């Protein structure tokens, strides 16, 4: 009764201006993006929508997932996940791989290590934890997701060069 409101504090994650372009690039390339976070799913979905993620309104609270079957259904149906534990992140990566997907995982924290280790390609941010950087296949020195299209292009170039070289050996 004796309290007086003196102000409000508003905090938000800033979405970079180029985020919609980057997400658009991945959509054009046929890359299925998943946003997996330990944060509140409504908050994660709102940020994903501001960034321009297609189907950001399809989100799931991981605390409601209790069986492997529920997890498999969720990871194939939803694009955004909140309140995800490190073990669940690993399980999601494993299930995507079991469903024939090639999985690249980005992360920066200790909570991402299990999933990074499970992924086909793991990408850590240079400003992230040492644990994430040590387990990752690639470390983004600029800690900027905007570098990802360049990584995808380089990876595809390597794969194409290997195919070309292999076909020369098989033909001759």
Could you tell me what each predicted segment is?
Residues 2-22, 27-42, 58-66, 78-87, ...:
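Conserved beta-strand/loop elements of the cytosolic catalytic core of P-type E1-E2 ATPases, chiefly
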Residues 51, 55-105, 109, 119, ...:
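Membrane-embedded transport module
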